[in-house]
UniProtKB/Swiss-Prot annotation:
InterPro entries: Alpha-1_3-FUT_met (IPR017176), Glyco_tran_10_C (IPR055270), Glyco_tran_10_N (IPR031481), Glyco_trans_10 (IPR001503), GT10-like_C_sf (IPR038577)
Sequence intervals crossing the membrane: 10-30
Any GO CC annotation of this UniProt entry: endoplasmic reticulum membrane
Gene: FUT10
Any single Pfam family the record assigns to this protein: Glyco_tran_10_N
Protein name, entry field: GDP-fucose protein O-fucosyltransferase 3
Major subcellular location class: endoplasmic reticulum
Length: 478
């Protein structure tokens, strides 16, 4: 009888909690709906904001993926939720009340919230960050947050001091970011120590009769890192099997020709047969590390790495990769690889960490353990969720400070949050000219992006809407 009474009491409590949550959510929907029903008609809006007239005016039903539990001590009113406005269609969500620990914020891509009094932060996605449309004038309580996990080739102007310092919060590949995404392509330690795809060295030696010691798979040709020029020169000193669109000399099976198959077991089996993989990033930036590195380490193949200058800080072991930067010329690199190819003991030293399942790099272990998001893990938030919650929490922290009569804490990004030098080119001999794509596109693009960054900063600091004509006139003023 006591158990039945307890069960009824528990059910009653749950019903009450659910009712309270629904009432709060309904109030928020009604209040925001009243605001959203008012269409902006500002004659002062210029090119970038004219498109707001076409924004949808219906409200997406609120939902909360984890269930909203409010702290009673906060005594939050229904209209107290800060609005986080995505200045990008990235999430596709026109309205969502999301919980971030004990805090809650309203996330939306609907730009009709631009002038709402509860809009506290604007969230930008770096790849589609554009001068054509910015939320200006920027009010004192408007925070700007940048999510940019990709290389500089997607938007060079972000990588210069005048622009990156416009943002209060960042989530980038840099360890110095407020939400570092350095390990965004690595699921965890288990995939590094797994022997699932490992091909024994004896078998690899046998396969060498028909395979080159090195394999190269790239279909994004002539990127800012100029990797194809290096590999082309390397090919004159050692055999390289190239399966991608770039420098291809060996075809993939038809069923693996689709780029979507790059994570297929069949593709992994092909790569795992090789002793070495050329792991060259498309850009050279501190902490910019992609699947180019992690894939060979997962497969038990030694990566020959070119990319992040800080890569040694992230390798699982002191001897787990060959770094191109340690060789003065592809000729020296080829000689070293041939020596390892002939000497099983020296080669084995590069995969010893994997065979023993030992990751000695404490920085890597700590980063994986402490990150607040997961990779392909339904039990964890993804990094976009984590970014949203980071901004939401920081906004709430400042709200609480102001409620105590204290000034809000000001955050600002700096150039270490996206650290990429100007692209350079490889020119190994007069017979191998510099790649036209770099000379005629990437380097001038980087140089012009400096002017664009200065012009954009001046216009944003003016804190008025501006046209694309104004922007480009300022860029080419000198």
């Amino acid at each position: 009888m006591v158990r039945i009474q307890r069960g009824k009491l528990l059910a009653f409590c749950l019903c009450v909690m659910a009712t309270v949550f629904l009432l709060i959510t309904l109030q928020v929907v009604v209040e925001l709906g009243k605001f959203e029903g008012k269409k902006f008609k500002n004659s002062h809006l210029k090119d970038g904001h004219a498109q707001m007239e076409a924004e949808p005016l219906h409200l997406h039903p609120f939902f909360n993926r984890e269930g909203l539990t409010l702290n009673r001590k906060k005594t939050l009113a229904a209209d107290s939720f800060p609005i986080m406005l995505w200045w990008s269609p990235l999430t596709g969500e026109t309205g969502r009340l999301g919980q971030c620990g004990a805090d809650a914020c309203f996330f939306t891509i609907n730009r009709t919230y631009l002038h709402h009094h509860r809009t506290k932060a604007f969230l930008f996605y770096g790849t589609d960050f554009s001068i054509d449309s910015l939320p200006l004038p920027r009010k004192a309580h408007h925070d700007w947050a940048l999510f940019h996990e990709e290389s500089p080739k997607n938007n060079y102007k972000l990588f210069h001091q005048p622009v990156i310092t416009l943002f209060n919060y960042t989530a980038t590949f840099s360890r110095h970011s407020h939400l570092p995404l350095t390990t965004q392509y690595l699921e965890g330690t288990e995939v590094l120590t797994s022997l699932r795809h490992l091909v024994p060295l004896r078998s690899k030696n046998h396969l060498r009769k028909s395979l080159a010691p090195l394999v190269y798979v790239q279909s994004d040709c002539d990127p800012p890192s100029d990797r194809d020029s290096y590999v082309r020169e390397l090919m004159t000193y050692i055999e390289v099997d190239s399966y991608g669109e770039c420098l291809r000399n060996k075809p993939l099976p038809p069923q693996l020709s689709n780029p979507a198959s790059m994570d297929a077991d069949g593709f992994f089996r092909i790569l795992a047969q090789y002793k070495f993989i050329l792991a060259f990033e498309n850009a050279v930036c501190d902490d910019y590390i992609t699947e180019k590195l992690w894939r060979p380490l997962k497969l038990g193949v030694v990566p020959v790495y070119y990319g992040s200058p800080s890569i040694a800080d992230w390798l699982p072991s002191n001897r787990s990769a060959i770094l191109v930067s340690e060789f003065s010329h592809p000729r020296e690199l080829a000689s070293y690889i041939r020596a390892l190819d002939r000497d099983d003991r020296r080669y084995q030293a590069y995969i010893e960490w994997k065979l023993k399942g030992e990751i000695s790099n404490q920085r890597l272990l700590t980063a994986l353990r402490e990150r607040k998001w997961g990779v392909q893990d339904v039990k964890q938030d993804n990094y976009i969720d984590a970014f949203e919650c980071m901004v939401c929490t920081k906004v709430w922290d400042n709200i609480r400070l102001q409620e105590k009569g204290l000034p809000p804490k000001r955050w600002q990004a700096d150039v270490t949050h996206l650290s990429c030098p100007e692209p350079t080119v490889f020119a190994f001999s007069p017979l191998v000219p510099r790649r036209r794509s770099l000379r005629e596109m990437w380097i001038p693009s980087f140089q012009q992006s400096k002017k664009e960054a200065r012009a954009l900063r001046w216009l944003v600091d003016r804190n008025q809407n501006f046209s694309t004509q104004e922007f480009w006139a300022l860029v080419f003023k000198d």
